[in-house]
Design a protein with these regions (language model features):
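Conserved alpha/beta-domain cores
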Residues: 249-560
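Non-catalytic, soluble scaffold/interaction modules
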Residues: 1-322, 328-335, 365, 372-373, ...
Length: 560
């Protein structure tokens, strides 16, 4: 029996033979060209063919699995014709006289490195997208045939890595789960596995040997454990665990439509975090009570230029209308120097996490901010909208932002354009400054939403993307929990509500703590709604609150 440890990114137990993904590798020729125009036309021809392929794949994915599955290929279409991407390839061909293949390859390396250097895990995962798009164009230039799964029976798939489009084309009927050498929980393969409801493990490194192919294997997506040639005891244990997981999933399905109320009658709202209008379907399927965080950056990241007011309005309107009266809280632009978008022309900064980003950009470039606010207020006529400002550190920033809101509303009224008068305005609490000033900030807004990812990072002075700091980056640290408790108390003293929209909101080991603190809303990924509802309904705060509130004041996080 061989046991390998990785990182589980999609829960479940998979049992079957191990199969290695066979990918056709394309050698990249490099030579100096004498006719750059001809080389550019070679690239453009392959680019056009790639865009057509991606369109066909998007339609196939939509027919088989809905809009959410199709979105990956549509995003790749936009990336393939991105002006910055094209310009970089053009520079290599025209200025350095590179052949098309070398120009595409070097551009992919350059863009992937840029994404990987960013602080945001979502943006880091985009490195795989640009590699994938480039590989598709290179494959067309070389005439290479894409690899795939050639097995006739369901298998556990093993690979060094899976490109986003490869993940998107996986057929659930032949896939029991997959294991990759690299990857993260925010990668496309992890998201796709969770969408398909199959177990997945990433980060096993070079532990999977070619000689393991075809041998019996069991994977546990919850623990990240891979067992090859399992003995009877291990096999029986994991099979029983799979049955228990299936039983729990059936139980969770019965919770749809049930209230989020503890045994002693304390209620809490459970909302969802989304990144595009296509995610609304997942919110509805998983019975989310609303949307607590709609990241509006997708409009800017997927556009070759600043999105217009009408483009933004249509996107916001669609989400509000689709949510059918349920609350939708949209976060204003959270672009920063660590999320470079070419047309923003942001300067390179040594410390982008503390540089020009989010609300700071909006307040220094009011034309961008006002365009977004106009689109938001126009969309408010079609549903229950809340507007949320990110990365706040002071009262004056909030007052300045609110001035622009009032200015936009006056303009819309003068133009006879309808909008809702009762739009709530809130802020994200994700800096220690905002937490410390929460008693004053609470007088300025209608709600707080705590972004625990950045709040933990800034409070502990610890880069959450640095794996070497894993033991020091602890969201359970009493310093973080005390700040959340203080923010909640200050919010309630001033008659406003408070929520949590970071990853910590879905941490079931802290659900009782958040209920004890008095948090009013938890906003999580759609798939986390029902497990969180179950945890809430199993809690009795009369018993747990005194113990947990005392633990927050403890010296060591282990007491929690």
């Amino acid at each position: 029996m061989i046991s390998i440890q990785g990182k589980g990114v999609s829960s479940g137990v998979g049992v079957g033979p191990l199969y290695f993904y066979h990918r056709t590798k394309t050698e990249i020729p490099r030579y100096t060209v004498t006719d750059p125009d001809a080389e550019w036309h070679r690239f453009k021809g392959a680019q056009t063919a790639a865009i057509e392929q991606l369109g066909e794949l998007a339609e196939k994915a939509r027919a088989e699995a809905g809009d959410e599955a199709a979105m990956l290929f549509e995003t790749h279409q936009m990336m393939a014709e991105d002006l910055d991407y094209e310009e970089a390839i053009s520079d290599h061909i025209n200025n350095e006289k590179m052949n098309a293949e070398a120009a595409i390859s070097d551009t992919a390396v350059q863009f992937a490195a840029m994404f990987e250097s960013m602080d945001d895990s979502y943006m880091q995962a985009r490195a795989a997208d640009v590699r994938d798009v480039s590989d598709r164009i290179l494959g067309i230039l070389s005439g290479a045939v894409q690899g795939g799964i050639a097995s006739d029976v369901p298998v556990l798939l093993a690979a060094d890595d899976l490109a986003p489009s490869e993940t998107g084309q996986l057929d659930k009927s032949t896939l029991l789960g997959f294991i990759t050498a690299g990857g993260s929980g925010s990668s496309h393969k992890a998201i796709r596995a969770r969408t398909m409801g199959i177990p997945a493990i990433v980060g096993v490194g070079d532990a999977l040997k070619p000689e393991y192919e075809g041998r019996p294997c069991i994977i546990d997506g919850a623990t990240g454990n891979v067992v090859i040639d399992p003995d009877d005891m291990t096999r029986d244990y994991l099979l029983k665990k799979r049955e228990e997981q299936l039983r729990l999933q059936r139980l969770l399905e019965t919770l749809k439509g049930q209230p989020n109320v503890t045994k002693d009658g304390k209620s809490i709202r459970i909302y969802c975090n989304i990144g595009s209008p296509d995610d609304v379907h997942a919110v509805q399927v998983n019975d989310g009570g609303g949307i607590g965080l709609f990241r509006s950056e997708f409009l800017y990241l997927n556009s070759p230029d600043y999105p217009t007011e009408d483009q933004q309005f249509e996107a916001y309107k669609k989400v509000l209308a689709d949510m059918n009266g349920k609350e939708v809280i949209i976060r204003t632009l959270d672009i920063g120097a660590d999320k470079q978008i070419g047309y923003f022309n942001l300067p390179k900064e040594d410390n982008p996490a503390m540089g020009m980003r989010a609300l700071r950009i909006c307040l220094t470039r009011p034309e961008i901010f006002k365009t977004q606010l106009r689109a938001l207020y126009r969309a408010s006529a079609f549903g229950k909208l809340g507007i949320m400002f990110p990365m706040v550190t002071s009262v004056w920033e909030v007052r300045e932002a609110k001035k622009y809101c009032e200015e936009v509303k006056r303009d819309l009224k003068a133009e006879g354009i309808p909008f809702a008068e009762d739009v709530q305005v809130g802020i994200m609490i994700e800096t220690p400054a905002a937490a410390i000033m929460s008693d004053r900030l609470a007088k300025e807004v209608d709600f707080f939403s705590c972004g625990t990812n950045d709040l933990t990072q800034y409070t502990l002075a610890c880069d959450r993307q640095n794996n070497d700091l894993g033991r020091f980056y602890d969201p359970h640290n009493p310093a973080v929990l005390r700040l959340l408790k203080m923010v909640t108390e200050n919010a309630h003293k001033n008659g406003i509500w408070v929520g949590i929209c970071g990853e910590l909101g879905a941490d079931l080991t802290l659900t009782e703590t958040f209920l004890a603190i008095g948090v009013d809303e938890l906003s999580v990924s759609p798939r986390a709604v029902l497990p969180l509802r179950n945890a809430v309904r199993m809690t009795d705060t009369r018993e747990s609150a005194p113990r947990l509130l005392a633990a927050i004041d403890a010296e060591f996080p282990e007491t929690l």
